[in-house]
């Protein structure tokens, strides 16, 4: 029994050391950018570790350029800005971010990556698309007179205004707060290495950030 316990302890220690290296991050970003380029969707891509530290961000040429149509009255946006516009469910809660324009797309990509890392586990990979289905005011989304999703409202739990958020993203090693709260916008996934959860990846390419109010209309379509 002692020998078995020793082997288990050694194995656990070795497995616990699995982390994303600089080489891993570079390869992940390159593969994601290659996929986005192949789809004709310039994207901004972020990679974080298990506790929300940003390990890398890559902005492809032409990704999420500011849309003058969303500019406030009297404001001429810089056409070189890379931003997203935040939208939500008109029948759901106001997150305090709804309708904001010119939010840096890097923050959206990081929020998606953090969500993929935080909500996943060794046994369950939790994407932001999955989050979108279970955080809305009806489950399934769009089905009136049904209870809210099991994680209704969790997307605002990490915002600075949240009662659940006690510490901001300071100089510590983490856990770090997601810059836009937990994300319900498709495009965030966990990252595994040798079977261990080591972080998350997030991508944004459509200039929008919100949630899927109709989870059925995205089948067969790219939406990140």
Model-derived features with residue positions:
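Flexible, solvent-exposed loop/hinge segments and secondary-structure transition points
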Residues: 17-223
